[in-house]
Regions:
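Conserved beta-alpha-beta core of the PfkB/ribokinase-like small-molecule kinase fold
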Residues: 38-111
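Short beta-strand segments
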Residues: 8-11, 40-42, 71, 134
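Conserved N-terminal subdomain of the carbohydrate kinase-like
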Residues: 1-37
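Short, small-residue-enriched loops and turns at beta-alpha junctions
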Residues: 14-17, 45-49, 76, 98, ...
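Conserved phosphate-binding/catalytic region of the ribokinase-like
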Residues: 59, 106-206
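A short, aliphatic-rich alpha-helical micro-motif
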Residues: 33, 81-83, 125
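A general structural detector for well-ordered alpha-helical segments in enzyme core domains, enriched
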Residues: 24-27, 53, 57, 119
Length: 206
């Protein structure tokens, strides 16, 4: 899923049919990359997509000086980092550990909260970017260029968990583009995820 976000206008979500894969430049032309402020690329790479397509999209976005938000993990994330450092990475705790802290085939690796905080801070400092690690019903751990943030989740009457992560990502990126305020962006993302959890319609925060 690709979202292109422009402040004061709508957010367009483009779901690409894996049976009709466009060339990378055609995808970004469809996104009107010169007209947007940021690009959010979320979800696992579908079968049929080339292994380097995510990294190429990131590279082109960053070459156009756009904020690039990565909401995926594993080999695709590592391949992208080798080619172009993301502005923002958002993954859950298990994905962070499996991507950055151990072999991707390892299982049942866990860390204390303090250990996890240190790893997020160090990785953010190394990559000189923002890393957000969601932890389900526990507070969200984040770091921006080595500065740590912790954001409590909102307690709601959840009726749906589908698309909560996507809602968080979209809310965070929208606020970050608008204000560049990390705390405000984390709060907006948290609010959007909570509203989605309260809705029977996944992806809806109205």
């Amino acid at each position: 899923m690709l979202n292109n976000i422009k402040i004061n206008q709508t957010t367009n979500e483009i779901i690409l049919n894996v049976n009709v894969i466009a060339e990378i430049h055609e995808i970004l032309e469809e996104l009107q990359i010169d007209e947007v402020d940021g690009i959010l690329l979320a979800g696992s790479r579908p079968l049929g997509w080339s292994e380097n397509i995510y990294s190429k999209i990131a590279e082109i976005a960053l070459n156009h000086k756009k904020i690039f938000f990565a909401d995926y993990w594993g080999k695709d994330l590592l391949n992208t980092i080798n080619n172009a450092i993301h502005s923002i990475i958002k993954i859950n705790e298990e994905e962070f550990i499996n991507t950055f802290c151990c072999d991707l085939t390892s299982e049942n690796i866990s860390f204390s909260d303090d250990e996890l905080k240190n790893k997020i801070v160090n990785k953010s400092q190394e990559l000189k970017n923002i890393i957000i690690v969601t932890r389900g019903c526990k507070s969200t751990f984040s770091a921006a260029n080595g500065v740590f943030y912790e954001t409590p989740v909102k307690k709601v009457n959840a009726v749906n968990v589908i698309a909560c992560g996507d809602s968080f990502s979209a809310g965070f990126l929208y606020e970050y583009i608008k204000s560049k305020d990390i705390n405000a962006s984390l709060q907006t993302g948290t609010d959007c995820a909570a509203k989605n959890a309260e809705s029977l319609c996944p992806g809806s925060i109205v």
